[in-house]
């Protein structure tokens, strides 16, 4: 037979308190199976304790002690001392709670001692010098006859007393205990674990109910990122639909107003005049649709085609007089339409009214014609579209036409005003340039600043003119 290993012998000795020879004997009896040998040892101890306690006919097992005196300790013979039954359930509880898998744990003995101390039902008074009477284990002869003592049992008591500083507290106490007191087992621990699991389940269910209640009362309080994006998309779609409805409504109002206004008129602003043939609009010019303007806004605009824009007109010609209304009042009515609908009536005038209107502002037109070449010559060279510092400025005029040109970020704002004045559509000094979002207005006083200083650094910037009152 293979002899037990040294580790198994040391483990058996440290757990049971037996001697080395007894540990070797027990391990050999159980085929070097350490857990079985230890379990057999504690079963023998438990059987011996129950057999010995059943022979005792006395009813008073308990030890009644106080701080300085133990009753009957002087008159009772040493060999009549009996173990205090209060300590036995603790040992039995430790034996029943033993798990072989814990043998490798260095804190195993400490855990056993904690279980023993936790199973004690009463507090421990100060230790007494009468060890035979107080601790329940006789000082000279613990079990009387040696043949009735199980092998290694005496070493068990000594081992526990030696290894456990709280051993005395497990057998001391002023509470009277019987041999029939209940023995603690793992049932209490299982009940505590089961109660903790049930409490955890209950908390989880309450948390789900609270979350569902909060969602029912305030669904917007906990929205996922996808739901937030969907709501934003719905808001954008709603805003676009409202914008389209307003545009249709304005179109209907324009049609109703067109019934009371001339069918063919040339727009002329009192603050602007132009006699240049390239910017004079004749009847029969083609209509420019809004979608074409939007397409042109996304593309770089050639300066040669920036000055060509068509206005909407109808087949009929504008008569010379409308119920005695002079041309000046008619022009004011056209400007009123612009103020109401945010734009200017895109209609061309008849040849007769063109002559009448341009006669009133012939002198300013001549001055603008003379200044146009000078302003065009003062403009810097237009950079190419591949230049990283180039920006395209698209300006919407009051007549809904768009003019654009490329500049460098280092160019001054004055060049933009020169470019607009060179177009001859508005009178210099009567307007300002506005960026819609974030809204910011630029006047001629800002002409010394560069586009980069004015935060006009995007590849394409959309601006519009705002006439000064």
Curated annotation (Swiss-Prot):
Record keyword Secreted present: no
Domain UBA-like per the UniProt entry, residue ranges: 4-43
Superkingdom of the source species: Eukaryota
Chain segments carrying region Disordered: 119-188, 264-324, 355-383
Polar residues bias: start-end ranges: 271-289
Pfam families the record matches: UBA_4, UBX, UIM
Membrane-traversing stretches: none
Signal peptide from the UniProt entry: none
Keyword Phosphoprotein: yes
Keywords: Phosphoprotein, Repeat, Ubl conjugation pathway
Domain UIM: 188-207, 231-250
Positions of post-translational Phosphoserine modification: 181, 224
Domain UBX: 386-464
Coiled-coil boundaries: none
Organism: Arabidopsis thaliana
InterPro entries assigned to the protein according to its UniProt record, in alphabetical order: UBA-like_sf (IPR009060), Ubiquitin-like_domsf (IPR029071), UBX_dom (IPR001012), UBX_domain-protein (IPR050730), UIM_dom (IPR003903)
Protein name per UniProt: Plant UBX domain-containing protein 9
Sequence ranges of Basic and acidic residues compositional bias: 368-377
Organism ancestry: Eukaryota, Viridiplantae, Streptophyta, Embryophyta, Tracheophyta
Compositionally skewed regions (Low complexity) per UniProt: 119-129
SUPFAM superfamilies in the record: UBA-like, Ubiquitin-like
């Amino acid at each position: 037979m293979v002899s037990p290993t040294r580790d198994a012998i040391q483990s058996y000795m440290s757990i049971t308190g037996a001697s080395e020879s007894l540990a070797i004997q027990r391990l050999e009896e159980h085929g070097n199976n350490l857990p079985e040998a230890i379990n057999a040892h504690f079963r023998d101890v438990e059987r011996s304790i129950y057999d010995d306690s059943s022979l005792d006919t006395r009813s008073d097992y308990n030890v009644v002690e106080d701080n300085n005196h133990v009753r009957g300790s002087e008159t009772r013979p040493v060999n009549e001392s009996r173990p205090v039954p209060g300590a036995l359930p603790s040992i039995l509880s430790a034996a029943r709670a033993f798990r072989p898998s814990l043998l490798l744990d260095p804190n195993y003995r400490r855990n056993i001692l904690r279980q023993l101390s936790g199973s004690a039902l009463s507090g421990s008074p100060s230790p007494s010098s009468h060890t035979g009477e107080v601790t329940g284990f006789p000082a000279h002869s613990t079990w009387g006859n040696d043949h009735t003592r199980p092998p290694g049992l005496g070493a068990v008591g000594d081992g526990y007393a030696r290894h456990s500083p709280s051993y005395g507290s497990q057998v001391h106490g002023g509470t009277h205990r019987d041999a029939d007191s209940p023995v603690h087992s793992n049932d209490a621990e299982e009940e505590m674990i089961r109660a903790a699991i049930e409490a955890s389940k209950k908390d989880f269910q309450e948390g789900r109910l609270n979350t569902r209640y909060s969602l029912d009362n305030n669904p917007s309080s906990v929205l996922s990122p996808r739901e937030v994006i969907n709501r934003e998309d719905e808001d954008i779609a709603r805003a676009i639909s409202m914008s389209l409805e307003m545009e249709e409504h304005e179109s209907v109002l324009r049609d109703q107003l067109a019934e009371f206004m001339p069918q063919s008129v040339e727009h002329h602003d009192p603050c602007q005049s132009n006699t240049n043939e390239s910017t004079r609009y004749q009847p029969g010019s083609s209509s420019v649709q809004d979608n074409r303007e939007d397409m042109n806004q996304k593309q770089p605009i050639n300066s040669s085609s920036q000055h060509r824009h068509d206005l909407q007109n109808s087949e009929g010609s504008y008569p010379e007089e409308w119920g005695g209304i002079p041309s000046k009042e008619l022009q004011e009515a056209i400007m009123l339409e612009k103020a109401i609908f945010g734009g200017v009536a895109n209609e061309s005038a008849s040849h007769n009214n063109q002559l009448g209107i341009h006669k009133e502002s012939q002198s300013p037109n001549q001055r603008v014609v003379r200044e146009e070449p000078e302003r065009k010559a003062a403009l810097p060279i237009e950079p190419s579209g591949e230049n990283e510092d180039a920006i395209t400025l698209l300006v919407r005029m009051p007549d809904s036409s768009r003019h654009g040109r490329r500049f460098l970020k280092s160019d001054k704002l004055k060049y933009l005003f020169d470019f607009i004045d060179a177009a001859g559509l508005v009178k210099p000094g009567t307007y300002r340039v506005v960026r819609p979002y974030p809204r910011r207005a630029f006047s001629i006083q800002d002409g010394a600043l560069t586009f980069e200083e004015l935060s006009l650094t995007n590849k394409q910037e959309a601006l519009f003119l705002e006439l000064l009152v």
